[in-house]
Amino acid sequence: MYISNLRLQNFRNIPAKSFDFKNSINFIVGKNGSGKTSILESIYFLSHSRSFRSSQLNRIINHNADEFIIYTKAYNPDEITISLSRKKNSNNISKLNLEIQKNHTEITRNLPIQLINPESFNIINSGAQQRCKVLDWGAFYLDKTFLKIWQQTKFLVKQRNSALKQNYPYSYILSIDKKLCEFAEILDYKRQAYFTKLKPKIYEILSHFNPNLQLDIDYFRGWNLHKSLAQVLEESFNYDNKYKVTNHGPHKADIVLSVSHKPIQDIFSRGQQKLLICALKLAQGEIHNSENDNKCIYLIDDITSELDSIHTLTLFNYLKQLKSQVFITTTEKNKINEFIDTNSYILEI
């Protein structure tokens, strides 16, 4: 997959603009506030039907307009068109090859995106939910049955929490538990299958960036490894009932990152953390590319942030050999001069 043309209308501070890109590394250069991150955001929005910058989508519409439109022409390898529009206080309207989509799933499958930006540090510094999203992104593309299992599991956890809050009888909770355990086991199996591929690939890429970095990467399924979920839910019912929330289950799954049993945020510097994030994201993209025909697109906001020149160059050279489409933003062209070659494309805004 690669994007050949992107058109934006009333998206953020871009009233109307068309951009052409190469199926290689595309540098977007501009001052702060020039709109370079908005270009990355629009591509991400096309894939995910949401922003990585704001949950208040009305704010994304240019203040002089009532609607934004994103349109792209891409190749996968055949030409496809994807568009997304949104009016104020309305829902997104997504189209794939001019056909309105009932949901965004097919577009997401057609447009796999990996984003590396300042908020990516949340994978390390925030709770398990952020790391669990890493597993779910990969499993979604690896296994077409994953989404329905994930949706059903999420629904059952929500239903159980609601029943706890409303003090439903224990017999009713048990009926939910029976279904939840069934779907949770399948979900765990699919996540583990993806993690088995992801872990060695992270180590491989990280050693390329910095062979001296040592860490442990483990998968936690969300409940005791030596007990069934049914047993854990039964044993923890009084605690769950007291706090009116389900404390064990697949919604608590995590990728545990540590050094000698200590959290890596207590050990790694910011630069080392960014190298790990890059290794993780690149690993996800490489696994995707090996399992699917359409290649992952990488969005990197401010590539030089937190990295010295040596590690920035190492990262860039790694990106170049992937032969995937990459979008990189920077505020200063002189910081990327040594990375530019005949295959690169530079957009100055």
Curated annotation (Swiss-Prot):
Q: Give one Pfam family, short name only.
A: SMC_N
- For ATP, which residues are the binding ones? 30-37
Q: Which domain of life is it from?
A: Bacteria
GO molecular function terms attached to this record = ATP binding; single-stranded DNA binding
- Keyword list, A-Z: ATP-binding, Cytoplasm, DNA damage, DNA repair, DNA replication, DNA-binding, Nucleotide-binding, SOS response
Record localization: Cytoplasm
Q: Enumerate the Gene Ontology biological process terms.
A: DNA replication; DNA synthesis involved in DNA repair; double-strand break repair; SOS response
Which GO cellular component terms are attached?
cytoplasm
Keyword ATP-binding assigned to the entry: answer is yes
Question: Can you tell me which family this protein belongs to?
Answer: Belongs to the RecF family.
What biological function has been recorded for the protein in this entry?
Answer: The RecF protein is involved in DNA metabolism; it is required for DNA replication and normal SOS inducibility. RecF binds preferentially to single-stranded, linear DNA. It also seems to bind ATP.
**Official protein name in the record:** DNA replication and repair protein RecF
Q: Which organism is it from?
A: Francisella tularensis subsp. tularensis (strain SCHU S4 / Schu 4)
